[in-house]
């Protein structure tokens, strides 16, 4: 039974996802359905967490929109995600960056990770 579930999970996982971690700035291209039309909307921000594993994996992106913090959680292997672009890699020492919620301006900046990796 477990083998059947693993095969179904493997079949529904995407293989076009770039490597990114918490602290990275990403642009998530999301398919939005409005009536009969489908268009692509870009949500760009900083990845503050990745949770789960396999086909259930999801990630949360935070951005500031007109001074208000906006967070959106995306299932990683969802068909509504058109593509994910990594803008820059951030140097952080935490897996969950929830402390960014209480910071504004320069205090919310994340240093760029060098090419040593």
From Swiss-Prot:
Family: Belongs to the bacterial ribosomal protein bL19 family.
GO biological processes: translation
Coiled coil stretches, renumbered: none
Cross-referenced Pfam families: Ribosomal_L19
Keyword Ion transport attached: no
Role this protein plays: This protein is located at the 30S-50S ribosomal subunit interface and may play a role in the structure and function of the aminoacyl-tRNA binding site.
Keywords: Ribonucleoprotein, Ribosomal protein
Name of the protein in its database record: Large ribosomal subunit protein bL19
Any Gene Ontology CC annotation: cytosolic large ribosomal subunit
InterPro entries cross-referenced by the UniProt entry: Ribosomal_bL19 (IPR001857), Ribosomal_bL19_CS (IPR018257), Ribosomal_bL19_sf (IPR038657), Translation_prot_SH3-like_sf (IPR008991)
Any one GO molecular function term: structural constituent of ribosome
